[in-house]
């Protein structure tokens, strides 16, 4: 009986990394950053491949801005999109995606252009 419990615990510990979800490691522009000029790119880095299914950039008035993405919806660990030139204001980036394990994820962050 004790052997079965130890064996089950060992299997659970070894399998845990296989079920871990991807996490967002970094974003550009940085969260709550204040920029002197429009950013050259909107980017995210993940610890495991992620298929970004939606990325949106809006200003404080809810107006949408186009983002040109170059990944073709392929799973990536580094995602980047090029925004049009942004006028001064507050901006929100919202995204959603699907991790390699099928788990859906989403998030948002803000930045300001002076």
List the model feature ranges, each with a label.
Residues 43, 47-112:
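Acidic, low-complexity Ser/Thr/Gly/Pro-rich repeat segments typical of extracellular/periplasmic
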Residues 10, 15-17:
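N-terminal signal peptide c-region/cleavage motif recognized by signal peptidases
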